[in-house]
């Protein structure tokens, strides 16, 4: 395979050269423990504080509201488990949606086993949550609302500001999983009344194994990892200084390049969508047509199975996915696609292609040409398509 076109940037991204360069000294040269008192280590303490400030500035937050974690899944777990524990005397009801990442859904299920009640809101055909449904679900014992900023599979951007205003009006904590959105769209936690926000380094050309949880000052939240006094005694463990430098540098890069970078991604994404929808029949675009992440395209191709399509694409040097990378081993159709009303047999034929700023028009042309051949070949072997074609010809 000589050609490689990477279109799975929702799963992970390539670490940017400037990010890697910034990280390297903290592995072999400036490797001191930030908690030590000698100057060799205290330099690293200052560096960690500098990255915290960078991230806070990107969100319109304060630096003492940023807590470093091992990634988005940990941040989601911390937000739900530690706040529900802290506020359970006030109530034991949580509101979320049916299209959340499994880091939220599985944590919600865990909390249900421990006596909490969870309302899972429906979404519309585009994957949008209706803020009115959020407000209607609120009960006197509701303590937390968690709605993702943008969906990791279909790219739909949720009405976060409106939901935040509702939560704020009712005095309920509001958490958003912004793993896909951070670095792709502007976010201001004050404007959106966000109390907690999860993000991850490897989704914005940073390293894996590092993320953060924004926690608004005044929010009661229990310690998630017990031990030392790191992260203001809320998450014990020696700080991952190279990773923190990586996510801080990646954040700086993402904010500085956002306008130009996402404009190019959006242009290529729209070109991809136009060609696929015009040239491959019996295809559906999943997600909102306009309120979606600039690099996301998600399709369903009738009469074929997504895994077979991915294998053929891989043989052609194209990396895509049929849903979240966290559930790639599952044979079940995407819970997100089922939530937007697609039947199982159509949801099985899904393909998510997520771009980066390096993707060119020539790359898209190659992908679409390969996709046309692959879909045609797979439909030619499909009994469902054969039956459909016979009925169409009658």
Regions found by a protein language model. Give the residues of each.
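Pyridoxal 5′-phosphate
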Residues: 1-394
């Amino acid at each position: 395979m000589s050609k490689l076109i990477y279109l799975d940037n929702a799963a992970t991204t390539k670490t940017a050269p400037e990010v890697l360069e910034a990280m390297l000294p903290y592995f072999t040269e400036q490797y001191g423990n930030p908690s030590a008192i000698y100057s060799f280590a205290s330099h690293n303490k200052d560096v960690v504080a500098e990255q915290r400030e960078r991230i806070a500035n990107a969100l319109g937050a304060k630096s003492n509201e940023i807590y470093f974690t091992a990634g988005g899944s940990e941040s989601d777990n911390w937000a739900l488990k530690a706040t529900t524990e802290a506020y359970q005397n006030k109530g034991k009801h949580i509101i979320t949606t049916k299209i959340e990442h499994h880091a939220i859904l599985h944590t919600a299920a865990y909390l249900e086993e421990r006596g909490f009640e969870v309302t899972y809101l429906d979404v519309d055909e585009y994957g949008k949550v209706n803020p009115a449904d959020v407000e209607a679900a609120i009960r006197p014992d509701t303590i937390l609302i968690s709605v993702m900023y943008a969906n990791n599979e279909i790219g739909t951007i949720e009405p976060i500001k409106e939901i935040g205003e509702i939560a704020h009006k009712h005095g309920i904590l509001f958490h958003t999983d912004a793993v896909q959105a951070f670095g792709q769209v502007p976010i201001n936690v004050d404007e959106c009344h966000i109390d907690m926000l999860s993000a991850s380094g490897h989704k914005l050309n940073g390293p894996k194994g590092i993320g953060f949880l924004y926690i608004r000052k005044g929010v009661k939240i229990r310690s998630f990892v017990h031990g030392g006094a790191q992260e203001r005694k809320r998450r014990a463990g020696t700080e991952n200084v190279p990773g923190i430098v990586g996510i801080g540098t990646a954040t700086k890069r993402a904010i500085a390049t956002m306008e130009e970078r996402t404009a190019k991604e959006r242009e290529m994404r729209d070109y991809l969508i136009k060609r696929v929808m015009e040239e491959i029949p019996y295809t559906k675009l999943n997600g909102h047509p306009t309120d979606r992440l600039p690099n996301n395209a998600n399709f369903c191709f009738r009469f074929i199975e997504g895994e077979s399509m991915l294998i053929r694409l891989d043989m052609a040097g194209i990396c895509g996915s049929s849903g979240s990378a966290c559930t790639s081993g599952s044979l079940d159709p995407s819970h997100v696609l089922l939530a937007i009303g697609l039947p199982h047999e159509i949801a099985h034929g899904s393909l998510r292609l997520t771009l980066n700023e390096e993707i060119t028009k020539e790359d898209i042309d190659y992908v679409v040409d390969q996709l046309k051949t692959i879909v045609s070949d797979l439909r030619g072997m499909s009994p469902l398509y054969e039956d459909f074609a016979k009925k169409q010809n009658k």
